Amino acid sequence: MKLKIVAVVVTGLLAANVAHAAEVYNKDGNKLDLYGKVTALRYFTDDKRDDGDKTYARLGFKGGTQINDQMIGFGHWEYDFKGYNDEANGSRGNKTRLAYAGLKISEFGSLDYGRNYGVGYDIGSWTDMLPEFGGDTWSQKDVFMTYRTTGLATYRNYDFFGLIEGLNFAAQYQGKNERTDNSHLYGADYTRANGDGFGISSTYVYDGFGIGAVYTKSDRTNAQERAAANPLNASGKNAELWATGIKYDANNIYFAANYDETLNMTTYGDGYISNKAQSFEVVAQYQFDFGLRPSLAYLKSKGRDLGRYADQDMIEYIDVGATYFFNKNMSTYVDYKINLIDESDFTRAVDIRTDNIVATGITYQF
């Protein structure tokens, strides 16, 4: 019984981010799963900064241990290895994606700490389903609690204390991260920094239909406030996010959409932070029985009050792609990002990409 409970709980806690896993150990109330993938990937685009080989490998483990009848401990680690570097620079770009541990106490929920997904991604993940691109208008790495980031203490409650199936909520605290870097003008890589903050999210999923909302608020760092000396950067003392989303996932159909607004948070171009951004993402996919999964999406993020450029589109594109699954372990895909932003004085000044990109890849995963 202990083994069964641990297996079910750990799978439930971590399955949202892990498609497959190989069981390594399962004995005496302890369970350890190993998972990974290798993706041979290439981008084709006129922009030489993005064109070329993007091959990578990913490895992770997730585990749990039965402490007593009411309490289970769990941990999760994931690492990304770049496969396109020469051997003299083999570790360049490698990174820890996830590293956290915590406890789950019966129907009262779970509490963990470490590098994890921010509660904003509870909504952002619903549209981050494209073969290669997508999920990038407001879900950004190490940007407050919108995506993967560090210093997160997260409480999650599933099925509302076991009373309402499908109703989940979370509360999150993020500690201050200065990201000190003397090579930057303002003494830090301020686009990836954050002050103390909190976030809450709630989702309800029933019979394939889902609806959810999230709110976060954080202090901004001194470096971020100093960066406001450039009028292209945000000047507020707090960073805030409001987002809502819907999804449908049943009968081989997948559809999801979200809308969000951020204040003094969303990054754009080559190291700028917008005063205000409004973003919209929508994706539709269909899974054929013979393995083909076509995908169509539209994404847009508009920045407000961007210095002398006023209001501007920071991201806007249509994405057309398809994935073919040979089996549960092997797949191949193509993804075409049709950029709808035209080159202008604004895009040149802040270095926003305007070219289309085609990505082709083949993936083995376990």
Curated annotation (Swiss-Prot):
Keyword Membrane: yes
Subcellular location: Cell outer membrane
Keyword set includes Membrane: yes
GO MF terms, alphabetically ordered: porin activity
Gene Ontology CC, one term: cell outer membrane
GO biological process: monoatomic ion transmembrane transport
Signal peptide positions on this chain: 1-21
InterPro entries: Gram-neg_bact_OMP, Gram_neg_porin_domain, Porin_dom_sf, Porin_gammaproteobac, Porin_Gram-ve, Porin_Gram-ve_CS
Inducing stimuli: Unlike E.coli, constitutively expressed at low and high osmolarity (0.3M NaCl) (at protein level). Expression is under the control of OmpR-EnvZ two-component system; still expressed at very low levels in high osmolarity in the absence of ompR-envZ (at protein elevel).
CDD domains (UniProt xref): gram_neg_porins
Membrane topology: Multi-pass membrane protein
Main location per the UniProt record: membrane
Keywords of this entry: Cell outer membrane, Ion transport, Membrane, Porin, Signal, Transmembrane, Transmembrane beta strand, Transport, Virulence
NCBIfam families found in the cross-reference section: PRK10554.1
Note: This strain has 2 ompC genes; it is not clear which one has been detected in cell outer membranes nor deleted in PubMed:8359885.
Quaternary structure, from the entry: Homotrimer. Forms mixed heterotrimers with OmpF and with PhoE; other mixed heterotrimers are also probable.
Functional note: Forms pores that allow passive diffusion of small molecules across the outer membrane. Plays a role in virulence.
Name of the molecule in the record: Outer membrane porin C 2
Organism: Shigella flexneri serotype 5a (strain M90T)
